[in-house]
Amino acid sequence: MAKLTVKDVDLKGKKVLVRVDFNVPLKDGVITNDNRITAALPTIKYIIEQGGRAILFSHLGRVKEESDKAGKSLAPVAADLAAKLGQDVVFPGVTRGAELEAAINALEDGQVLLVENTRYEDVDGKKESKNDPELGKYWASLGDGIFVNDAFGTAHRAHASNVGISANVEKAVAGFLLENEIAYIQEAVETPERPFVAILGGSKVSDKIGVIENLLEKADKVLIGGGMTYTFYKAQGIEIGNSLVEEDKLDVAKALLEKANGKLILPVDSKEANAFAGYTEVRDTEGEAVSEGFLGLDIGPKSIAKFDEALTGAKTVVWNGPMGVFENPDFQAGTIGVMDAIVKQPGVKSIIGGGDSAAAAINLGRADKFSWISTGGGASMELLEGKVLPGLAALTEK
């Protein structure tokens, strides 16, 4: 990586500002999935082991008005992090002011402090989300000139807590998680071991146009599944029943198919139902066409076999988006089949691009079989699209 990393700077005795991604799901104040906290531990532990004083910044959900703050405090995260680290985490419960400054100045080497939800600053003029220059400068002033960005999940955003701080410190460096994310995803796309197969699912073509275009140039094959299948079908005049379709993207789908030169591989059958919810009939289609009064909710067994064949011998696989409505056991087979086809390839480098695909791998017990599961849905999508991520661009060059 051409940017400085946390290992390139002297941390001892320094107040080190760290952007982490602790945007975890909460239910009644209880964390329901702590993966993002666990993912940040190597960087935090390294800083405190080196004698640094870690000052952590993160957002949690969206905070638009004062009343939103109550359920969006990072207090439960501070408690969870303290348990994971086996030491106290100082939590002043504010984003600025004398109380925060006093707590930071009282830190000793090896201690950790968590600033309250950065998006509390969005209540008054969206200062965090709009990268208010004064806020970035203020937060930067709380440290000793070193900023570590370890929040890949927000690297595609230019916020005060990443780009704003970076602009006002001597050295802005990557943490271990950010470094790994970039290494796995960018290298897979830019310098893959071949054959390189990309698998794209999800419901909308509109979300993936840029990704499909970029991967058609980089990959040897691009497999398409999920709800967007039916926009590609309709673009070719195939009957889709009541399946999801983006009517305004039919021309785009047609153009992508023409541009693909056979690289774009579509399902050859579906699992169809007579309703999305409360259905009374589920069956496999004979071929591509979906029956009148039915809608396709997963790829079918012939498609699973076809995709299995397309993945045979693959050395690099990037997967983003499920093959069907995997949350429902009736429509999981496609996603499971594709996951199993990926991980059985000998010596394959297999990468999941965050979001629903990551949830599917975790929920369906396949997570440990993949080389890398990204922590950032939107950020990994933009990386797959070949875009420059603002949070990464703002870091100091080696």
UniProtKB/Swiss-Prot annotation:
Transmembrane stretches, start-end: none
Pathway(s) of this molecule: Carbohydrate degradation; glycolysis; pyruvate from D-glyceraldehyde 3-phosphate: step 2/5
EC number: 2.7.2.3
Keyword Hydrolase assigned: no
Residue sites binding substrate per the record: 21-23, 36, 59-62, 119, 157
Localisation per UniProt entry: Cytoplasm
Keyword entries, A-Z: ATP-binding, Cytoplasm, Glycolysis, Kinase, Nucleotide-binding, Transferase
Binding site for ATP: 208, 296, 327, 354-357
Catalytic activity as recorded in UniProt: (2R)-3-phosphoglycerate + ATP = (2R)-3-phospho-glyceroyl phosphate + ADP
Enzyme class: transferase
Primary location group: cytoplasm
Gene3D superfamilies linked: Phosphoglycerate kinase, N-terminal domain
Pfam hit, one: PGK
Family annotation (PROSITE patterns): PGLYCERATE_KINASE (PS00111)
InterPro entries in alphabetical order: Phosphoglycerate_kinase (IPR001576), Phosphoglycerate_kinase_CS (IPR015911), Phosphoglycerate_kinase_N (IPR015824), Phosphoglycerate_kinase_sf (IPR036043)
Entry's Gene Ontology molecular function annotations: ADP binding; angiostatin binding; ATP binding; phosphoglycerate kinase activity; protease binding
Any one GO cellular component localisation term in the record: cytosol
Any one GO biological process: gluconeogenesis
Subunit structure: Monomer.
HAMAP family (UniProt xref): Phosphoglyc_kinase
Family: Belongs to the phosphoglycerate kinase family.
The protein's name in its UniProt record: Phosphoglycerate kinase
Natural source organism: Streptococcus pneumoniae serotype 2 (strain D39 / NCTC 7466)
